[in-house]
């Protein structure tokens, strides 16, 4: 699974 990608996208998503 790609949790790192999800974390990065979720972190740089709303911002």
UniProtKB/Swiss-Prot annotation:
- Its GO biological process terms? L-leucine biosynthetic process
**What keyword terms does UniProt attach to this protein?**
Amino-acid biosynthesis, Branched-chain amino acid biosynthesis, Leader peptide, Leucine biosynthesis
Question: In which domain of life is the source organism classified?
Answer: Bacteria
Please tell me whether the keyword Amino-acid biosynthesis is annotated for this protein. yes
Please explain the role this protein plays, according to its UniProt record: Involved in control of the biosynthesis of leucine.
What is this protein's record name? Answer: leu operon leader peptide
**Highest classification ranks of the organism:** Bacteria, Thermotogati, Deinococcota, Deinococci, Thermales
């Amino acid at each position: 699974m790609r949790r790192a990608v999800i974390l990065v996208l979720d972190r740089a998503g709303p911002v």
